[in-house]
A protein has these predicted regions:
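An extended, acidic
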Residues: 144-217
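Glycine-rich phosphate-binding loop plus the immediately following alpha-helix
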Residues: 115-150, 154-158
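Short gly/ser-rich anion-binding loops that grip negatively charged ligand groups
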Residues: 33, 37, 97, 140-144
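DPxDG-like acidic metal-binding loop motif
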Residues: 84-95, 99-120
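Short basic, glycine-rich beta-strand/loop surfaces that mediate nucleic-acid
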Residues: 79-80, 109-112, 210-216
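Solvent-exposed alpha-helices and their adjacent loops that cap or buttress functional pockets
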Residues: 52-53, 78-84, 92, 100-104, ...
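General beta-strand structural signal in soluble alpha/beta enzymes
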Residues: 60-64, 89-91, 100-102, 121-122, ...
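N-terminal subdomain of lithium-sensitive/metallo-dependent phosphomonoesterases centered on the IMPase/IPPase/PAP
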Residues: 1-90, 152, 197-198
Length: 217
């Protein structure tokens, strides 16, 4: 069947929820058991099994790695029944393997889907991330800005002092200069050991999480 069959996101959303649910349940059995690889493999197996039940012509564009690095859900792998719309898929069956193994919060199952050709085929490299909460002006902060400028811009629009801003950053040596620059503004930093997808999501509800911005690579 042609891969140009119309893409209906509402029709696929329940199927994707099932895919994510089964991957999460499979990895949950390994919470706190100190085995990152087993937790990840359980999630991969479950996600792949469920994806292959969906009526899609799916191609993994962001996955577990290149074909020679990952036996399943590798970049370029075709999934689904082979009928239905052609789709691109970005996934991480278990984002936060260390968090899972240590029974720590913020491990997630992540999957996104779009029409064929709609997703960037990104290589396995560090990419800059920047997120703020809702309600701010478009373009208020950008990747081109120094970290301190981002904090000042956000504080100005929020109507508060930089000291009232909290930034979430992944604790890695490569971020040390950024951490120092943010702290120089008076802003506080919530360092996380893993799980930067969750860190980005925390920005969506700053009144609950206390996090105003995420930045890092």
């Amino acid at each position: 069947m042609s891969s140009t069959v119309e893409f209906h996101d509402r029709m696929l959303s329940l199927g994707l929820a099932r895919v994510a649910e089964q991957a999460a349940l499979a990895s949950a059995k390994w919470v706190g058991r100190g085995d990152e690889k087993a937790a990840d493999q359980a999630a991969v197996n479950a996600m792949r099994e469920q994806l292959n039940k969906l009526d899609i012509q799916g191609v993994v564009v962001i996955g577990e790695g290149e074909r020679d690095e990952a036996p399943m859900l590798y970049i370029g792998e075709e999934v689904g029944t082979g009928t239905g719309p052609g789709v691109d898929i970005a996934l991480d069956p278990l984002e936060g393997t260390t968090l899972t193994a240590k029974d720590m919060p913020n491990a997630l199952t992540v999957i996104a889907m779009g029409p064929r050709g709609s997703m960037l085929h990104a290589p396995d490299v560090y990419m800059e991330k920047l997120a703020i909460g809702p309600g701010y002006s478009e373009g208020l902060v950008t990747l081109d800005m120094p970290a301190a400028t981002r904090v000042s811009a956000l504080a100005s629009e929020k109507g508060c002092s930089p000291a009232d801003i909290t930034v979430c950053i992944l604790e890695r040596p490569r971020h040390q200069e950024m951490i120092e620059e943010v702290r120089s503004t008076g802003a506080s930093i919530r360092l996380i050991t893993d799980g930067d997808v969750a860190g980005v999501m925390h920005c969506a509800e700053p009144e609950k999480t206390g996090i105003d911005m995420y930045m890092g690579s």
